[in-house]
Protein backbone atom coordinates (compact mmCIF):
# COMPACT_ATOMS: atom_id res chain seq x y z
CA UNK A 1 0.00 0.00 0.00
CA UNK A 2 2.99 2.33 0.22
CA UNK A 3 2.72 3.18 -3.46
CA UNK A 4 -0.94 4.05 -2.98
CA UNK A 5 -0.28 6.69 -0.36
CA UNK A 6 3.13 7.88 -1.54
CA UNK A 7 3.05 7.68 -5.35
CA UNK A 8 6.17 8.44 -7.41
CA UNK A 9 6.70 12.13 -8.11
CA UNK A 10 9.07 11.91 -11.06
CA UNK A 11 8.18 12.69 -14.65
CA UNK A 12 7.82 9.48 -16.61
CA UNK A 13 7.81 8.47 -20.25
CA UNK A 14 5.84 5.24 -19.81
CA UNK A 15 3.30 3.78 -17.40
CA UNK A 16 3.00 0.00 -17.59
CA UNK A 17 -0.55 -0.99 -16.63
CA UNK A 18 -0.75 -4.61 -15.45
CA UNK A 19 -3.70 -6.59 -16.73
CA UNK A 20 -6.12 -8.89 -14.90
CA UNK A 21 -9.12 -10.92 -15.98
CA UNK A 22 -11.85 -9.56 -18.24
CA UNK A 23 -15.57 -10.18 -17.81
CA UNK A 24 -17.41 -10.77 -21.09
CA UNK A 25 -14.50 -9.15 -22.90
CA UNK A 26 -14.87 -5.93 -20.91
CA UNK A 27 -12.80 -4.22 -18.23
CA UNK A 28 -14.25 -5.08 -14.77
CA UNK A 29 -13.96 -2.79 -11.71
CA UNK A 30 -10.71 -4.34 -10.43
CA UNK A 31 -8.92 -3.80 -13.74
CA UNK A 32 -10.56 -0.40 -14.21
CA UNK A 33 -8.96 0.65 -10.92
CA UNK A 34 -5.52 -0.10 -12.36
CA UNK A 35 -6.15 1.84 -15.56
CA UNK A 36 -7.69 4.72 -13.62
CA UNK A 37 -4.60 4.91 -11.38
CA UNK A 38 -2.45 5.31 -14.49
CA UNK A 39 -4.79 7.93 -15.94
CA UNK A 40 -4.72 9.95 -12.71
CA UNK A 41 -0.93 9.93 -12.67
CA UNK A 42 -0.80 10.93 -16.33
CA UNK A 43 -3.27 13.78 -15.76
CA UNK A 44 -1.27 15.06 -12.79
CA UNK A 45 1.93 14.95 -14.81
CA UNK A 46 0.31 16.83 -17.69
CA UNK A 47 -0.85 19.58 -15.33
CA UNK A 48 2.67 19.96 -13.94
CA UNK A 49 4.77 19.51 -17.07
CA UNK A 50 2.43 19.78 -20.05
CA UNK A 51 3.57 16.33 -21.18
CA UNK A 52 1.60 13.08 -21.12
CA UNK A 53 3.33 9.68 -20.81
CA UNK A 54 2.66 6.68 -23.02
CA UNK A 55 0.57 3.97 -21.41
CA UNK A 56 1.65 0.38 -22.05
CA UNK A 57 -1.38 -1.84 -21.52
CA UNK A 58 0.00 -5.25 -20.60
CA UNK A 59 -2.07 -8.42 -20.69
CA UNK A 60 -2.53 -11.42 -22.95
CA UNK A 61 -5.62 -13.48 -23.70
CA UNK A 62 -6.71 -16.03 -21.13
CA UNK A 63 -8.30 -19.34 -22.09
CA UNK A 64 -11.72 -18.02 -21.08
CA UNK A 65 -11.32 -14.54 -22.59
CA UNK A 66 -12.55 -13.49 -26.07
CA UNK A 67 -9.68 -11.06 -26.60
CA UNK A 68 -6.40 -9.92 -25.00
CA UNK A 69 -6.74 -7.92 -21.81
CA UNK A 70 -4.49 -5.19 -23.24
CA UNK A 71 -6.94 -4.49 -26.07
CA UNK A 72 -9.85 -4.03 -23.67
CA UNK A 73 -7.68 -1.82 -21.44
CA UNK A 74 -6.67 0.34 -24.40
CA UNK A 75 -10.31 0.73 -25.40
CA UNK A 76 -11.23 1.71 -21.83
CA UNK A 77 -8.49 4.35 -21.64
CA UNK A 78 -9.50 5.83 -24.98
CA UNK A 79 -13.14 5.99 -23.87
CA UNK A 80 -11.86 8.02 -20.91
CA UNK A 81 -10.33 10.47 -23.38
CA UNK A 82 -6.69 9.38 -23.45
CA UNK A 83 -5.01 9.97 -26.84
CA UNK A 84 -4.95 6.80 -28.94
CA UNK A 85 -1.41 7.47 -30.13
CA UNK A 86 -0.20 7.36 -26.52
CA UNK A 87 -1.69 3.96 -25.69
CA UNK A 88 0.54 1.01 -26.57
CA UNK A 89 -0.31 -2.65 -26.06
CA UNK A 90 1.54 -5.80 -25.02
CA UNK A 91 -0.66 -8.84 -25.69
CA UNK A 92 1.62 -11.85 -25.04
CA UNK A 93 1.93 -11.97 -21.25
CA UNK A 94 0.17 -14.55 -19.11
CA UNK A 95 1.39 -13.49 -15.65
CA UNK A 96 3.01 -10.62 -13.76
CA UNK A 97 6.55 -11.70 -14.57
CA UNK A 98 5.78 -11.73 -18.29
CA UNK A 99 3.97 -8.37 -17.99
CA UNK A 100 7.30 -6.74 -17.20
CA UNK A 101 9.47 -8.82 -19.52
CA UNK A 102 7.34 -8.07 -22.58
CA UNK A 103 6.45 -4.49 -21.62
CA UNK A 104 10.14 -3.72 -21.30
CA UNK A 105 10.60 -4.79 -24.91
CA UNK A 106 7.72 -2.55 -25.99
CA UNK A 107 9.21 0.45 -24.17
CA UNK A 108 12.69 -0.17 -25.56
CA UNK A 109 11.40 -0.52 -29.12
CA UNK A 110 9.19 2.57 -28.84
CA UNK A 111 11.95 4.69 -27.30
CA UNK A 112 14.34 3.53 -30.04
CA UNK A 113 17.04 2.72 -27.53
CA UNK A 114 16.98 6.12 -25.83
CA UNK A 115 16.94 6.34 -22.01
CA UNK A 116 13.45 6.47 -20.53
CA UNK A 117 11.72 6.61 -17.17
CA UNK A 118 8.69 4.52 -16.25
CA UNK A 119 6.37 3.44 -13.47
CA UNK A 120 3.78 0.68 -13.28
CA UNK A 121 0.12 0.76 -12.25
CA UNK A 122 -1.65 -2.14 -10.58
CA UNK A 123 -4.04 -2.82 -7.69
CA UNK A 124 -2.89 -1.51 -4.32
CA UNK A 125 -2.61 -4.99 -2.78
CA UNK A 126 -0.43 -6.14 -5.72
CA UNK A 127 2.21 -3.38 -5.53
CA UNK A 128 4.85 -5.25 -3.52
CA UNK A 129 4.96 -8.46 -5.53
CA UNK A 130 4.71 -6.57 -8.82
CA UNK A 131 7.70 -4.46 -7.79
CA UNK A 132 9.73 -7.60 -7.07
CA UNK A 133 8.94 -8.99 -10.50
CA UNK A 134 9.82 -5.67 -12.11
CA UNK A 135 13.23 -5.80 -10.48
CA UNK A 136 13.82 -9.39 -11.56
CA UNK A 137 12.98 -8.43 -15.13
CA UNK A 138 15.56 -5.65 -14.98
CA UNK A 139 12.76 -3.12 -15.29
CA UNK A 140 13.59 -0.36 -12.82
CA UNK A 141 10.34 1.41 -11.97
CA UNK A 142 8.14 2.44 -9.05
CA UNK A 143 4.44 1.67 -8.73
CA UNK A 144 1.10 3.36 -8.16
CA UNK A 145 -1.91 1.45 -6.86
CA UNK A 146 -5.55 1.53 -7.77
CA UNK A 147 -8.15 1.09 -5.03
CA UNK A 148 -9.45 -2.41 -4.32
CA UNK A 149 -13.08 -2.84 -3.23
CA UNK A 150 -13.37 -3.74 0.45
CA UNK A 151 -15.36 -6.92 -0.15
CA UNK A 152 -12.61 -8.30 -2.41
CA UNK A 153 -9.63 -7.26 -0.29
CA UNK A 154 -9.46 -10.25 2.15
CA UNK A 155 -9.47 -12.74 -0.72
CA UNK A 156 -6.98 -10.64 -2.69
CA UNK A 157 -4.55 -10.39 0.22
CA UNK A 158 -4.74 -14.13 0.90
CA UNK A 159 -4.04 -14.96 -2.74
CA UNK A 160 -1.22 -12.42 -2.81
CA UNK A 161 0.38 -13.92 0.30
CA UNK A 162 0.27 -17.42 -1.18
CA UNK A 163 1.71 -16.14 -4.46
CA UNK A 164 4.48 -14.35 -2.57
CA UNK A 165 5.41 -17.52 -0.69
CA UNK A 166 5.46 -19.52 -3.93
CA UNK A 167 7.55 -16.80 -5.57
CA UNK A 168 10.12 -17.10 -2.76
CA UNK A 169 9.73 -20.82 -2.10
CA UNK A 170 13.48 -21.54 -2.10
CA UNK A 171 14.04 -18.99 0.65
CA UNK A 172 11.15 -20.28 2.74
CA UNK A 173 12.19 -23.92 2.27
CA UNK A 174 15.71 -23.03 3.40
CA UNK A 175 14.37 -21.27 6.49
CA UNK A 176 12.08 -24.22 7.25
CA UNK A 177 14.98 -26.66 6.89
CA UNK A 178 17.16 -24.61 9.26
CA UNK A 179 14.37 -24.35 11.83
CA UNK A 180 13.74 -28.09 11.57
CA UNK A 181 17.44 -28.89 12.00
CA UNK A 182 17.70 -26.59 15.02
CA UNK A 183 14.58 -28.17 16.52
CA UNK A 184 16.05 -31.65 16.12
CA UNK A 185 19.31 -30.51 17.68
CA UNK A 186 17.51 -28.92 20.62
CA UNK A 187 15.27 -31.96 21.09
CA UNK A 188 18.29 -34.26 20.97
CA UNK A 189 20.13 -32.12 23.51
CA UNK A 190 17.19 -32.14 25.89
CA UNK A 191 16.79 -35.89 25.51
CA UNK A 192 20.49 -36.38 26.29
CA UNK A 193 20.24 -34.18 29.39
CA UNK A 194 17.21 -36.14 30.55
CA UNK A 195 19.12 -39.41 30.09
CA UNK A 196 22.07 -38.11 32.12
CA UNK A 197 19.68 -36.91 34.83
CA UNK A 198 18.19 -40.40 35.12
CA UNK A 199 21.65 -41.95 35.34
CA UNK A 200 22.66 -39.80 38.31
Regions found by a protein language model. Give the residues of each.
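Juxtamembrane boundary at the C-terminal end of a transmembrane helix
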Residues: 187-200
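Juxtamembrane/start-of-transmembrane alpha-helix segments at the extracytoplasmic/lumenal side
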Residues: 163-179
